[in-house]
Amino acid sequence: MDHFFIKRKRNSEVKYTEACSSSSVESGIVNSDNIEKNTDSNLQTSTSFEPHFKKKKVSARRYNEDYLKYGFIKCEKPFENDRPQCVICNNILANESLKPSKLKRHLETQHAELIDKPLEYFQRKKKDIKLSTQFLSCSTAVSEKALLSSYLVAYRVAKEKIANTAAEKIILPACLDMVRTIFDDKSADKLKTIPNDNTVSLRICTIAEHLETMLITRLQSGIDFAIQLDESTDIGSCTTLLVYVRYAWQDDFLEDFLCFLNLTSHLSGLDIFTELERRIVGQYKLNWKNCKGITSDGTATMTGKHSRVIKKLLEVTNNGAVWNHCFIHREGLASREIPQNLMEVLKNAVKVVNFIKGSSLNSRLLETFCSEIGTNHTHLLYHTKIRWLSQGKILSRVYELRNEIHFFLIEKKSHLASIFEDDTWVTKLAYLTDIFSILNELSLKLQGKNSDVFQHVERIQGFRKTLLLWQVRLKSNRPSYYMFPRFLQHIEENIINENILKEIKLEILLHLTSLSQTFNHFFPEEKFETLRENSWVKDPFAFRHPESIIELNLVPEEENELLQLSSSYTLKNDYETLSLSAFWMKVKEDFPLLSRKSVLLLLPFTTTSLCELGFSILTQLKTKERNGLNCAAVMRVALSSCVPDWNELMNRQAHPS
């Protein structure tokens, strides 16, 4: 049948045939056979090389307000092109349906009973749809804002360490009163959508879980970390173990609250280690080999012959961690050595405080008396044997109010009044006030966050040298007492017998000598040998010359890195502006060996001051009225240095109360 049809050549085939024909003419070969061959070959090649045809671009249709008479409005959802939405069934059609014929067909087939409805009818339907859309979006926004507000209030309550019921009984009612007064009742009603009642506790637990997950995720990445731990007994007679962690993260060290453990069984080293193992390895899935430092006090619970918690922890770290005895605890132990005569003065001062503070009537009478004569202070401070270094403040208050206390004791006919009539006793009290204030100041310098071992060692060594200097001053022919301002003022304002003053000077000299010996015992020089060998960590730019670097016992690669680092003026500027830990974290890419060695030296804690702070907050939270409170979640939120990711928390479904 093919011979009955006339086949037309494609344009490309015609052009190709003409080209072949012209080439044949130019070559002088013109015959029908060549033309047929060329044509056949052209047909074969044309089947394998199809020409490219451009598709016709279809433009998107736009919505027209006249389409409302067919019952369609423009859909408010964020589509790429305009799409019609039926005001009756709310169906959304494709962009291609934006034709009057297709829209009319939808109305006739789906809603035939509404064909004769006037335009006003569809306008009312359009208005109803817009109102419902606005209501839903507004309700969603209010619900999300209410949920976020609930989280923020719970976070603030936990950070301020106040009772959870304060949010429901004080904060929310107060906010309602303020908004209702300043704005109107309608605005105040929006606050009622904020979840309340018992929701604050649930929100705090959720935030605590979120913060814990954030911290553990970081530690599970295999980074090095160090811990400090301490145990104490709260008001509910529950033994509590607090653990803090310091880890290298991004461009510096971070310190955070790791865990809060209740030790329910009898307190022993095995109990503490078992609970730690269960939490750190069992629950958190952390590797003890990444622990590079352990810091605790020197109590028998931690380091005793039978418990040996520290020994067990060092074993599970394969001795890859170092143990540091808390500097503050060691200073407190060293400060307890006092000669007998000075100890008697201290005991009598404590008796005076207990006589007045032990009776509410005596305390009120002294307060009234001090207020009437206009003293700067009206109360005495309690003496606690555990907080040994707080005696600086206690003795300072007694010495400041010595005349008022003397008059009060005479009125009370107490035998303790006679000690204030003894100039020798008052002079010794002035010295004890000064020396304990100095020790208390040293203790405060050893506390705080982000302190390194070099700073603490420098302060301890500086104090030991100061003690030696004071001894030399007192041994001279013309002794100087400038270092004890209250003592110096007292002997200048009062006539003190020269022989008595010499006796007091000998007792002071004996006390300073005893302090030097105890500080040398608790802070031996051999413990600081590692720091002296790695003094380049403290100041790497002090070793610019090769001769000084050779004496540091570094491997050749480390020597080369230190020489290159100390020659960089740009890094010297960073060293002067950044903290020591931040500086070594910054150069870890360029000087990995030195950075790694420095981080391992700086990472361990030097004190357990963070644990002490945690116990103070625990005392604030767990009052006598709330002695059965489980403070784990609140402690996490109150002490964590991580900031919650509110967007992640908001992804949880809101359930307004």
Curated annotation (Swiss-Prot):
InterPro entries in the cross-refs: RNaseH-like_sf
Coiled-coil boundaries: none
Highest taxon above the source species: Eukaryota
Family of the protein in this entry: Belongs to the FAM200 family.
Protein's name in the database: Protein FAM200B
Lineage, uppermost ranks: Eukaryota, Metazoa, Chordata, Craniata, Vertebrata
